[in-house]
Structures are given as structure tokens and as C-alpha cells.
Design a protein with these regions (language model features):
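Extended beta-solenoid/beta-helix repeat architectures
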Residues: 47-158, 173-174, 183, 189, ...
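Glycine-rich hexapeptide-repeat left-handed beta-helix
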Residues: 116-117, 127-283
């Protein structure tokens, strides 16, 4: 052991400020701050420009353009973008369809599409997503589809999630009480009045699904319910109004291959083995 405590004094260090996020709902709180930091990063790296030609062409529908970074994008007619409350960052290859309203702070990732008549604010949308309806204070990871009408608020959504048309979450209790979140057998006091749902990778919901405040849906779950589903659905679960059962792992893997192939992506052996091991673990 060559460690010498006396040498610690000679080590150069720099104090930095960090934010510790213990839970996913902590990340939602810092959407605005993180997008502000990202704007500085993008501007410094020169990855996205101010796109002056775009601003000149669309000046009547853009508010506070100095707080926007727009890449090589397709913006259809009658899109309103308001960066008064925070930056709007639109990455390359994004399509924003007609009659959509975007409010900062907002980041839309590379290759994503925003459907017509959408309203999106204070959110982070990952790459290659298809987004529609209303979003407020939501983090969505890559390749997730929420194409159709419906509301998502104060929520964290994983990758490769597919929301059926009309899927909507509640982010406020009728009695304005603080929302609790159950994960496995433990209940957490979030101390938040506004809180939506936490959806794992590869979750699918049927049309018209109603998601309660503080709901947690485990990765690989399939939700088919005309009523409010359970607020705590375990991983790889087939959920219906008749009850819960385990998703067949071979069928799940087959669906993942099909889904990714449609988007030009491979479901590789590492990820497949991860889910097979996960299935064996939850079956015990």
C-alpha cells in the first residue's frame, strides 16, 4: 500500500456544485435548470446555432428568440414557440407539425416528431420519439411513442414505451394532498402535490388507459384496463381488469425484436439476456 495521507494536502482540487437526485421525481424538479445548463453547453460547443434564417422567416410566431437554439429541423406552419419562461432547444432532424404550441424550458431530441395540435412545455424529450397531445413537466427517454391525444404531467418515462391513444395520467389528487409513491413493498412520501407516473422501458398501454397519481409501472409491462390500473405494477406483468399475470418472456423478446426492427435498431443479445435474467429473478 503506497498511500500516504500527507500527500493529500498537495493534491489540487476544485469545488463544484452538484444536485443529488435520490428519486426520479427529484429529476423532474430540475428540468428547467438542466435545460438552462444544456443551452450553455450547446452554445459553447457550437452544436446548434441560433439559426437566424429560421428566426427571420418565423418571427411572428417566436417569442424571445435569443433564448432558443434550433438545429436543422422541419417546422410546419402555425407553430408557436415561447421561450419566455426558459430556453427552447430543438435538436437536428426534428419535425414539429402544424398548430403546435411549445413553451420553454424545453428540449426536443434528435429525430423526434411532435404531432399536430400538441402543447408541450417544461419537458425533456429524448431522441427518435413521437409525441402528441399535452405534456407538462415530463422527461421522456428515447424511442418512446406518445403520438395521440392525452395528457402526461410531472412524470418520468423510459425508453421504447408505447402509449395507446387517449392514455392520460393524473398529476393532482382531488383533495390536493401530497402524493405517495410505492416501489415494491416500500411507500415513499414525496412531499409533492403535483406528481404523475413513472413508466419503465418497453411498457405498453392500451387505448384510453387512465394512470393514477404516483403510479409506477415496471419495465416490460402490458396494461389493458378500462378502469384505473393498480398504482404499482411489477416488472414484466400482463395487467387486465381480471388481474395480473407474468408476461411470457419469449413473446416479450419477440415483440422487442419486432418493435426495434421497425425503427432500424437491433435488440442485441446483451439486452435480451438482461431481460431473460430479470424474468428468472422475478419468477423465483
Amino acid at each position: 500500500n503506497n498511500f500516504n495521507p500527507k500527500k493529500i494536502k498537495s493534491i489540487k482540487f476544485k469545488r463544484i456544485d452538484i444536485i443529488l437526485c435520490r428519486y426520479l421525481w427529484d429529476i423532474i424538479d430540475y428540468i428547467g435548470k438542466n435545460i438552462n445548463d444544456d443551452k450553455k453547453y450547446f452554445a459553447h460547443q457550437g452544436k446548434l446555432s441560433g439559426n437566424s434564417k429560421f428566426f427571420e422567416k418565423n418571427s411572428k410566431k417566436l417569442i424571445n428568440t435569443q433564448n432558443m437554439l434550433i438545429g436543422r429541423v422541419e417546422i410546419q406552419p402555425n407553430v408557436v414557440m415561447d421561450a419566455t419562461s426558459g430556453p427552447i432547444i430543438i435538436d437536428d432532424n426534428v419535425t414539429i407539425k402544424s398548430n403546435t404550441h411549445l413553451e420553454g424550458p424545453l428540449y426536443v431530441g434528435n429525430g423526434s416528431t411532435i404531432s399536430p395540435l400538441s402543447y408541450v412545455k417544461n419537458s425533456v424529450i429524448g431522441p427518435m420519439c413521437k409525441i402528441g397531445g399535452e405534456l407538462n413537466s415530463v422527461v421522456i427517454e428515447g424511442y418512446t411513442n406518445k403520438v395521440h391525444y392525452g395528457f402526461l404531467g410531472n412524470s418520468y418515462i423510459g425508453e421504447w414505451v408505447n402509449f395507446g391513444a387517449g392514455t392520460t395520467n393524473s398529476n393532482l389528487k382531488n383533495n390536493y394532498g401530497k402524493v405517495r409513491v410505492q416501489m415494491n413493498d416500500e411507500v415513499f412520501e414525496t412531499n409533492r402535490i403535483h406528481l404523475g407516473c413513472f413508466i419503465g422501458d418497453y411498457v405498453k398501454t392500451s387505448i384510453g388507459t387512465k394512470i393514477n397519481t404516483g403510479s409506477v409501472y415496471g419495465p416490460g409491462s402490458m396494461i389493458f384496463s378500462k378502469d384505473f390500473p393498480s398504482k404499482n405494477i411489477p416488472i414484466l406483468t400482463w395487467y387486465t381488469d381480471s388481474g395480473m399475470s407474468r408476461v411470457g418472456i419469449d413473446k416479450f423478446i419477440l415483440n422487442c425484436h419486432r418493435m426495434k426492427k421497425r425503427r432500424g435498431v437491433d435488440f442485441d443479445i446483451v439486452e435480451e439476456q438482461f431481460y431473460r435474467n430479470l424474468f428468472l429473478k422475478v419468477e423465483k
